[in-house]
């Protein structure tokens, strides 16, 4: 899984201010009714393939009332409706991210996040010292640094000499990887967590694979997935003030990138509480779909718990708990190698763990589908993808086609025989195509360890499309930037520091903009209200500084959002 670090400057949210209703100081503006507006002289991409382009749109309050040319849309509003000329700039539906851990991203924005700041050990030493002195990295008694590049996990001995002695001898330190799956704990933290050689001896071979060990057979601090979860349990719960601050930071980050709605796929109690706090302050105007995690251990009990959670949050405005999230596997990069593959890793002879029993998972899928719940599965290896599709196939067979947009996400590797199954089963592919780059994360720490037949089909987006599948736009923020233009560029070019990652898997630019609008709304089961510029839909709109459909890939990549409008309200605008 390619782990790009955050590209947008951290803490930039503090520079953004929620703008009042309307377009203040707009060019070519004629005064009129505050509740009716016409945006005209624009290059409009509607997100509707039946009517993809227009030049004007009329808005009344929070809804779109007409789309077309200026004479046409003017008939739908009163003569004194406000008119705003956009001088030929691009107007799009608000972008929708179908896999964004936005509240976690907001927490990173207000924490000690090393993303894009640390590349060398010396830089890390300086960053950790500053985070300790300033208190920015202190979580209870633990010093936590977020967003570490994965290359550091190949240098655990050096990490130990830097952060387990001296001023850190009695200071628990947790370095969390940018992938959200891995980390490193110093000796003080390992001791507190009870992670010792004796503890590891009691684990099964599979369980031990989540912990790194040195040549002396002692834990070396590296942890992944279940090991990381054991460490994370020692972190204190966030206060309401911190949850609200993280939520506000997330909103402004998303708005600055033109993201007006998103699916939060790991909605634990703190995440849901943060959204409720935002709603209680009348600040949650974006539509957010949130999926609690289940494990397919006891399907009936787990789904009953989800229904209780839905009941508890049913009155939170703009928050929709309409599905469930499961992990089928982990990540593929060395040394983690917890992604489930159809062929074993060359260095271990293991395939990586499938994190559910296929029969239990099928039982869960049948029951969830019958209850009207969307199934959203982290499936990265080709073995996990195959198993996840088979579970959803069981639901389709038992219940017929419910029409629910069940979704797999990540799909770094897919076996060719599974390409048509996405279309056949009506399963959406929420791909993070920002990761489809030729670089260390897709070559050096992946290719030497994988069977050539598995490695060949890496981020096979075009193959899924050509077989009739639907791709929705997804970032996995804060694992990587939520910047849509960067993701579209990567999907179109697949260029990286080490060349091009299989150009045959490129995705046409316009298809990617459909992915981040209409298709993502479909993945959230909200296409009736958002995702396209069409009469009756919410007025979620973004103004872009250039014609992103026709400029070169590099010019498109550097595009900026000028205005972001959510439900008719301007929530972000540049100073220009």
Feature map (PLM): residue ranges:
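Acidic (Asp/Glu)-rich catalytic clusters
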Residues: 279-282, 309-315, 401, 422-424
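Ligand-binding beta-strand-loop-alpha-helix segment within the catalytic cores
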Residues: 428
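Divalent metal-binding segments
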Residues: 30-40, 45, 49-305, 322, ...
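Bacterial N-terminal signal peptides
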Residues: 10-22
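Bacterial N-terminal signal peptides that target proteins for export
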Residues: 1-13
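His/Asp/Glu-enriched, well-ordered alpha-helical/loop segment
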Residues: 366-376, 383-406, 410, 416, ...
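Bacterial Sec-dependent signal peptides at the C-terminal "C-region" and cleavage site
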Residues: 19-34
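A generic structural signal for residues embedded in beta-strands
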Residues: 66-67, 145, 541-544, 573
């Amino acid at each position: 899984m390619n782990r790009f670090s955050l590209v947008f400057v951290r803490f930039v949210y503090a520079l953004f201010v929620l703008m009042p209703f309307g377009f203040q100081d707009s060019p070519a503006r004629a005064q009129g009714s505050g509740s009716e507006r016409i945006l005209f002289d624009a290059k409009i991409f509607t997100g509707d393939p039946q009517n993809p382009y227009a030049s004007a749109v009329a808005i009344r309050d929070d809804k779109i009332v007409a789309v077309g040319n200026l004479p046409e849309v003017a008939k739908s509003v009163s003569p004194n409706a406000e008119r705003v000329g956009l001088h030929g700039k691009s107007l799009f539906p608000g972008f929708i991210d179908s896999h964004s851990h936005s509240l976690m991203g907001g927490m990173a924005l207000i924490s000690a996040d090393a993303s894009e700041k640390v590349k060398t050990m010396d830089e890390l030493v300086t960053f950790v010292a500053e985070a300790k002195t300033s208190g920015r990295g202190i979580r209870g008694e633990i010093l936590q640094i977020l967003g570490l590049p994965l290359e550091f996990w190949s240098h655990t001995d050096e990490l130990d000499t830097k952060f387990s002695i001296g001023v850190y001898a009695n200071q628990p330190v947790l370095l969390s990887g940018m992938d959200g799956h891995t980390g490193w704990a110093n000796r003080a933290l390992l001791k507190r967590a009870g992670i010792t050689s004796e503890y590891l001896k009691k684990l099964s071979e599979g369980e031990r694979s989540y912990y790194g060990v040195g040549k002396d057979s002692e834990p070396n601090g590296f942890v992944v997935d279940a090991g990381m979860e054991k460490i994370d349990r020692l972190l204190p719960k966030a206060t309401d003030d911190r949850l609200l601050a993280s939520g506000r930071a997330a909103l402004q980050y998303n708005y600055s990138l033109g993201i007006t709605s998103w699916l939060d796929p790991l909605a634990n109690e703190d995440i849901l509480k943060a959204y409720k706090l935002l709603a209680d302050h009348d600040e949650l105007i974006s539509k957010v779909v949130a999926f609690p995690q289940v494990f397919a251990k006891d399907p009936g009990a787990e789904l009953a718990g989800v229904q209780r959670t839905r009941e508890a949050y049913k009155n939170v405005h703009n928050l929709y708990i309409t599905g469930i999230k499961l992990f089928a596997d982990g990540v593929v990069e060395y040394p983690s190698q917890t992604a489930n593959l159809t062929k074993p890793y060359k260095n271990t002879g293991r395939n990586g763990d499938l994190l559910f029993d296929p029969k239990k998972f099928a039982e869960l899928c049948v029951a969830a589908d019958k209850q009207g719940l969307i199934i959203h599965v982290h499936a990265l290896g080709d073995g996990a993808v195959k198993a996840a599709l088979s579970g959803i196939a069981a639901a389709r067979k038992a219940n017929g086609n419910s029409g629910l947009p069940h979704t797999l996400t990540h799909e770094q590797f897919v076996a060719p025989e599974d390409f048509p199954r996405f279309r056949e089963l009506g399963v959406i592919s929420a791909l993070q195509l920002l990761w489809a780059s030729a670089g260390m994360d897709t070559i050096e720490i992946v290719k030497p360890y994988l069977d050539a037949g598995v490695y060949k089909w890496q981020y096979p987006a075009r193959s899924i499309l050509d077989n009739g599948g639907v791709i929705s736009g997804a970032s996995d923020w804060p694992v990587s930037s939520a910047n849509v233009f960067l993701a579209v560029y990567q999907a179109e070019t697949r260029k990286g520091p080490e060349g091009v990652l299989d150009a045959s898997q490129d995705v046409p630019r316009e298809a990617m903009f459909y992915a981040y609008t209409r298709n993502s709304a479909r993945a959230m089961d909200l296409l009736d209200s958002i995702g396209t510029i069409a009469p009756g839909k919410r007025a979620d709109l973004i103004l872009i500084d250039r014609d992103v459909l026709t400029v070169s890939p590099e010019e498109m990549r550097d595009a900026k959002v000028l205005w972001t409008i959510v439900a008719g309200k301007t929530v972000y605008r540049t100073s220009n």
